[in-house]
């Protein structure tokens, strides 16, 4: 380094996926310049990476209009906490990770107080509210986007933008071989395994986990020797799922962390929508994506969203590689039937794996966090 002046960086990640990506960025930035200081909103991974979290991201992880309204007090207090810091002691840089509505309000505050803004992982302007690109252009100094098809949206609006690859391309790696992983989870290698991925938000657990368990009950009746495994998100505790699990009567192996080891032992996975579908795609595991929100949220979204798919892995592919069951279609019968098709039809499962390999190719070759860390240092006027 040519400069040793310490810089204070506010970083905001409102969800579990943002916590993961933020942690990778912070680790890489601190490797390049250990004098940097990070604080803001994050979860356990960002804290472990060295971020002082003023607000825990688990308190912010809600989705949908009705769901946000139910948590408006917590979200408002978090905003006021960060706003006060920006006003009273402005950071040298504000890094925003996804979480668009909250983060764009914070970007306005930063702009008024002369704080540079880097937006890492773009709001989904290509999916809905495309007019936000112009607002972003007024409020954000630099975009670091993770999908190549996002670049033209910002270039057309004159927003400085860099395609940095997808951070998951660096991280989605099992820690051991499949046989070893099966043994470590206490699973029988001679019996098939279905993964249950109910999400990282408590709202998702309440809305989606019951139907996931009901579909698992149907699968157990159809395939008596089937095994189930559930990786518990870092934003949740055993208490969030234990009552529903106990009521289901199912024998489910629950583990925390090691999510990629879990994925690789699965023959198929039932999952909520979101970043996790990309992780599963990178592991090449056939999946069924389910999506349920309040009727109001869904009806509003149907009128605003401009893409043909809910699952980000299908959006990246540009076609339906894996089935999506939305709202009333996300019934236990339909979920069990789609998983059963994977288990009963090896050719169909193999075709799905080939489609997921195409998604993996489009996500880039790795090095994302390092590239974003380089942008951070550049915006701070530092050199590596």
UniProtKB/Swiss-Prot annotation:
UniProt-recorded name of the protein: Lipid-A-disaccharide synthase
User: Per the UniProt record, which EC number(s) apply here?
Assistant: 2.4.1.182
Q: Which HAMAP family match?
A: LpxB
- Pathway it belongs to? Bacterial outer membrane biogenesis; LPS lipid A biosynthesis
The yes or no answer to whether the keyword DNA damage is present is no
Q: State the UniProt keywords alphabetically.
A: Glycosyltransferase, Lipid A biosynthesis, Lipid biosynthesis, Lipid metabolism, Transferase
Annotated catalysed reactions: a lipid X + a UDP-2-N,3-O-bis[(3R)-3-hydroxyacyl]-alpha-D-glucosamine = a lipid A disaccharide + UDP + H(+)
- Coiled-coil parts of chain: none
- Keyword Calcium tagged: no
Q: Indicate the family of this protein.
A: Belongs to the LpxB family.
Phylogenetic lineage? Bacteria, Pseudomonadati, Thermodesulfobacteriota, Desulfuromonadia, Geobacterales
Describe the function of this protein.
Answer: Condensation of UDP-2,3-diacylglucosamine and 2,3-diacylglucosamine-1-phosphate to form lipid A disaccharide, a precursor of lipid A, a phosphorylated glycolipid that anchors the lipopolysaccharide to the outer membrane of the cell.
- Which GO molecular function annotations are given, in alphabetical order? lipid-A-disaccharide synthase activity; phospholipid binding
Cellular component terms (Gene Ontology) = membrane
One Gene Ontology term from the biological process aspect of the record: lipid A biosynthetic process
């Amino acid at each position: 380094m040519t400069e040793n002046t310490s810089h204070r960086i506010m970083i905001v990640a409102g969800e579990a996926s943002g916590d993961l990506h933020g942690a990778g960025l912070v680790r890489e930035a601190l490797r390049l310049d250990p004098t940097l200081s990070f604080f803001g909103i994050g979860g356990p991974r960002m804290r472990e990476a060295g971020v002082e979290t003023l607000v825990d991201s688990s308190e912010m992880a809600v989705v949908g209009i009705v769901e946000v309204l139910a948590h408006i007090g917590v979200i408002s207090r978090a905003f006021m906490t960060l706003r006060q810091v920006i006003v009273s002691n402005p950071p040298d840089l504000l890094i925003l990770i996804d979480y668009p509505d909250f983060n764009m309000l914070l970007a306005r505050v930063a702009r008024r107080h002369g704080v540079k803004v880097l937006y890492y992982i773009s709001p989904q302007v290509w999916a809905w509210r495309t007019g936000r690109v112009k607002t972003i252009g007024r409020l954000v100094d630099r975009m670091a986007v993770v999908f190549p098809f996002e670049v033209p949206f910002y270039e057309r609006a004159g927003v400085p933008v860099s395609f940095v690859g997808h951070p998951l391309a660096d991280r989605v790696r099992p820690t051991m071989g499949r046989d070893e992983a099966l043994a470590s989870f206490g699973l029988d290698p001679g019996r098939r395994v279905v993964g249950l991925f109910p999400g990282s938000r408590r709202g998702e657990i309440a809305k989606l986990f019951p139907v996931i368990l009901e579909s698992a009950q149907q699968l157990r009746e159809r395939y008596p020797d089937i095994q189930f495994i559930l990786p518990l998100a870092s934003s949740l505790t055993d208490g969030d799922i234990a009552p529903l699990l106990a009521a289901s009567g199912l024998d489910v192996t629950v583990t925390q962390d090691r999510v990629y080891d879990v994925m690789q032992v699965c023959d198929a996975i039932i999952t909520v929508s979101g970043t996790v579908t990309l992780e599963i795609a990178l592991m090449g595991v056939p999946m069924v994506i389910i999506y349920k929100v309040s009727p109001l949220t869904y009806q509003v979204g149907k009128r605003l969203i401009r893409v043909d798919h809910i699952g980000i892995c299908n959006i990246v592919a540009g076609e339906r590689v894996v089935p999506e069951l939305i709202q009333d279609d996300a019934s236990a019968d339909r979920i069990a039937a789609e998983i059963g098709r994977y288990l009963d039809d090896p050719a169909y499962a193999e075709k799905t794996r080939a489609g997921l390999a195409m998604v993996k190719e489009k996500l880039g070759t790795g090095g994302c966090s390092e590239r974003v860390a380089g942008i951070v240092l550049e915006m701070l006027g530092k050199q590596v």
